[in-house]
Amino acid sequence: MQGGREVGRESVSDLAEELGEGSLHPTAGGQSGDSLERRRIGYDGPVILPDANANSSRLDEGLSSSRPHPGELGGGWGEFEGFQESSAKSEEFSQSFELLGRAAECQPLRTPSTPKEGGSCQVQQGGPWVTGTAAGPSSESILSYEKVFRLAFQEVPVEQATEDVCSLDRFLETGSEETAPVPRLCSESRKLWRALQNTDTVSASRCLWSESHCRENLFPVLGIDAAQKSLSGDQGHDLEGSDCRKPEDLLGVSGFHLHHCKALIQTKLSGTSGSRQGSLITYSLFLKTPLQGNGRYITIPQKKIFTPRNLKMAFFNNNVC
């Protein structure tokens, strides 16, 4: 038993010295001789404890199968090989960046007059869209935004069109020629207005009322209810159901107040009867006002409801003709 243990210890120690990776030591004091402690620096692998009854060939075979890759372990706490490789790669990158920087520095120093030297790089200005001979880069900047836009977007000449556009000063100026024109009065409205003004003479007050469309337009302007007008043509014919009284007779009527008169203006038509051309009329206006309480209406004859100016403006502004 002791001979087998010694052979196992010698083979393990020899193998550890060859690899230079770790060593197997017996436990302190030699008290536990059956178990061996395997110490490793920089490797976390499975610990193999050889059996006392196993032969040396089986122990060697187990250690060789669990042996790690030589590049995976370092020599103790030495320098890490991966870090050295990364530093070498960084040096290669720094060299490549220095070469690119030198190539970029030589570009702005080039002028169109200098001859082309061997190994020097020259950038064609204008981009791939420029046709013809390539112009050399300027000393200020190789690719300026202004030149790029001018080459990409060509300027197209546009003809200057003269438009008749009024300026603001022309609108603000008030000249005599820009005054609003006075509306011309219709000739038929003038004839009607003259006929209404001259009620004394028969020739001036007569007009062809049935053939004129002024009749339909005049009644709404005067506020006359066209459904209740009388076209009988009798002289002095009053409206049906109207109680015609003089203003002084209305003073004794209870509940009558002149300021409460809200007008429904009607007319009494008069003219010559038997005319083939229709009724020739003169006008008389009546103010119809209600009585309080009974719902009856009193018609008050008023011949000057409208002033001449107001009546004239009502005629011409409402297009009676």
UniProtKB/Swiss-Prot annotation:
Biased composition (Basic and acidic residues): 1-12
GO biological-process terms attached to the record: intracellular transport
An example Gene Ontology molecular-function term: clathrin binding
Annotated Gene Ontology cellular component terms: AP-1 adaptor complex; trans-Golgi network membrane
Classification via InterPro entries: Aftin-like (IPR046359), Clathrin-bd (IPR029205)
Top-level taxon of origin: Eukaryota
Pfam family, one: Clathrin_bdg
UniProt region (Disordered), positions on chain: 1-85
Protein name: Uncharacterized protein CLBA1
